Amino acid sequence: MSAPQRRLPVYKKILEENKKKWMIKEFLEYRLSKYGYIDSEILKTPLGTRIVIYAERPSRIIGRKGAIVKEISNILTTKLGVENPQIDVIDISKIEAPEMFPKVVAYRIANAMAKGVRFRRVMFVAIRQLMEAGAKGFEIVVSGKLSTERARFEKQTYGKLYKIGYDAKNRVRRAVVHVLLKPGIYGIEVRIAPATLQYSDEYKIKPPVRPEAVQQQS
């Protein structure tokens, strides 16, 4: 870290660090979106910066003999000033069903539409996959010039899905993906309440436990 950065006030250091994290995430999504990139975590360590990439197809992100990872590491160092980046790629299927990640579902819909598949058919396929995966609730919105020259949207919802409040902001997963087709730009928004999610208003009252009867002494 340079001398001017050391003299920055604490709040400015925090803002600079968050800005750099945002720039790293934006770059990774731009560079790796077509290779199954889902999300990333950026952690500062004594040895440098550890970047954990969650992907649907890790082998495509790593590249042949690690070529893509090396390229990304070089760009992060030279262009974004990341100190000693250490990149790990994790297969999300080992953590949770891929269908529980809205970005996976949104990219599947976008890729199918880019191949000429009708949006309604793609939505129904995604709905079936989400239901089979056990999602607690979900919403899929496709917007654009769907059937006429005027832009509109079509929405499909299922199950219990909160749209406002703490749970909607912090627990319900959301992703937005855009795809450019011949008629124009289409937007795909996916919200998912994963199977393991427990809403704040969901609780169980345990039945009272009766104490064991005290045996009378003879």
Curated annotation (Swiss-Prot):
<dbReference type="InterPro" id="IPR009019">
    <property type="entry name" value="KH_sf_prok-type"/>
</dbReference>
<dbReference type="GO" id="GO:0022627">
    <property type="term" value="C:cytosolic small ribosomal subunit"/>
</dbReference>
<keyword id="KW-0694">RNA-binding</keyword>
<dbReference type="GO" id="GO:0019843">
    <property type="term" value="F:rRNA binding"/>
</dbReference>
<dbReference type="GO" id="GO:0006412">
    <property type="term" value="P:translation"/>
</dbReference>
<dbReference type="Pfam" id="PF00189">
    <property type="entry name" value="Ribosomal_S3_C"/>
</dbReference>
<dbReference type="InterPro" id="IPR005703">
    <property type="entry name" value="Ribosomal_uS3_euk/arc"/>
</dbReference>
<dbReference type="InterPro" id="IPR004044">
    <property type="entry name" value="KH_dom_type_2"/>
</dbReference>
<dbReference type="InterPro" id="IPR004087">
    <property type="entry name" value="KH_dom"/>
</dbReference>
<keyword id="KW-0687">Ribonucleoprotein</keyword>
<keyword id="KW-0699">rRNA-binding</keyword>
<dbReference type="InterPro" id="IPR015946">
    <property type="entry name" value="KH_dom-like_a/b"/>
</dbReference>
<feature type="domain" description="KH type-2">
    <location>
        <begin position="2"/>
        <end position="71"/>
    </location>
</feature>
<dbReference type="InterPro" id="IPR001351">
    <property type="entry name" value="Ribosomal_uS3_C"/>
</dbReference>
<dbReference type="Pfam" id="PF07650">
    <property type="entry name" value="KH_2"/>
</dbReference>
<comment type="similarity">
    <text>Belongs to the universal ribosomal protein uS3 family.</text>
</comment>
<dbReference type="InterPro" id="IPR036419">
    <property type="entry name" value="Ribosomal_S3_C_sf"/>
</dbReference>
<dbReference type="GO" id="GO:0003735">
    <property type="term" value="F:structural constituent of ribosome"/>
</dbReference>
<comment type="subunit">
    <text>Part of the 30S ribosomal subunit.</text>
</comment>
<protein>
    <recommendedName>
        <fullName>Small ribosomal subunit protein uS3</fullName>
    </recommendedName>
</protein>
<comment type="function">
    <text>Binds the lower part of the 30S subunit head.</text>
</comment>
<keyword id="KW-0689">Ribosomal protein</keyword>
<dbReference type="InterPro" id="IPR027488">
    <property type="entry name" value="Ribosomal_uS3_arc"/>
</dbReference>
